[in-house]
Amino acid sequence: VFEESYKHNYDSLYEATNTQPGQYNYYDSQWHPYFNKTGLHTMQSISKSFTAAAIGIAIKNGHIESVDVPIKSYLKEYEPSFSDKKKEAITIKDALTMRAGIKWDELSMLYTDTTSSCVQMEASEDWIQYVLDQPMENEPGKKWEYSSGVTMLLSKIIFEATGDNVSDYLEKELFEKIGINNYYWKQTPKGLTDAEGGLYLEPRDLAKFGYLYLNNGLWNGNSILPKDWVKNNSAELIDTIWPAFKYGQQWWFIPYDKDNIAWLASGLGGQRLLIVPEFDIVAVFTGWNVYEITALNSYLALQKVLGSILK
C-alpha cells in the first residue's frame, strides 16, 4: 500500500514556530506529537471516541440511566447556565452526536487561531463554564456542529455520575481489561480529564481499542462494551459538512457501498483509527501533519488502504 515512509526531526521542525508556552501549544515538540519524546503518541480527537466508550460503560454499570437524560441533571453546579429552555433540553445523546445546538466555531479555522471556540475554551480556567456560556444557535438534536466543547461536557458528566475522571474510569473499566498499560491524559486547569483531545497512546494500543469495536465490545470472550452500545453508534448516520463522512456518537463513518460502512476515529495532525467490519480490518495511522504537508496526509494513506481492499 505504501511506497514511501517519512522520518523527521520534530525539534528542528518546531524550532521556527515554537514560541507559545503551555501544554496546548500545538507547535511544542515536548507535547506533540510524542508525549515528552516517549513512545506515547498524541491521539488528539480520537480521545472523543474513548470518551463515548466511557459513557457506554457507565450506562452498562448503572451510573447513567440512558443517553436520553438531560445533561443538566449532571451539571448541577452550573445550574445558572441553563436559563435558556433550549439549553435545558440538551440530552447526553445530543452531546454524543454533536447536535447540542450550542453555538461553536471550530472547523472553519486552524487550531492556532485564537478566535477558534476550541482554542478559547482551552485558554479558559473553567472549560465547562466556557462551553455553557455560549448561546444556543439551534434546537438540540436538530443540526450537526462539530464541537470539542460538548465532549468536555461528557467528561464532566462521567465525573459526576461515577465519581471518577474519565482517565481513572477508563483505566479500571477498559484499559486494564484489554491490556493498555502505558498512556497519558492531559487535564484542564480544574483537574478534569481533557476528554476531547488529551489522550496519548502507543499505536498498538489504539489498535486494541479498534479491535474491541470490531468484535462488538467483546475482548477474549468478555463483554467490555455493551453490544447494543457498539451497534447503536452506527444506527443513525448523521450528515456532516463533508458529504463522504457521516457521524454517529463521537465516531465518524464512511459509507462505501449500499450496505457497508467503515468506522473512523480521527484526530488533528493525522491520527486515524480505521475499522472495516466487512473485511475484519483494523488500521492505525499516526502523524503530525499540522504543516499541511501533502505527502504526510493520512487521508491519502486511508484512501490507499480502502482502495486496495475494495478493488
Describe each PLM feature range.
Residues 101-187:
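A small/polar active-site loop signature that marks catalytic segments
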Residues 180-182, 187, 230-284:
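Active-site Gly/Thr loop motif
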Residues 1-33, 274, 280-284:
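A short, well-structured edge-of-sheet supersecondary motif
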Residues 31-32, 37, 61-102, 133-135, ...:
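Active-site helix/loop module of the DD-peptidase/beta-lactamase fold
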Residues 265-311:
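Structured C-terminal helix/loop/strand segments within mature extracytoplasmic catalytic/sensor domains
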Residues 42-67, 95, 154-158, 206-209:
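Active-site SXXK
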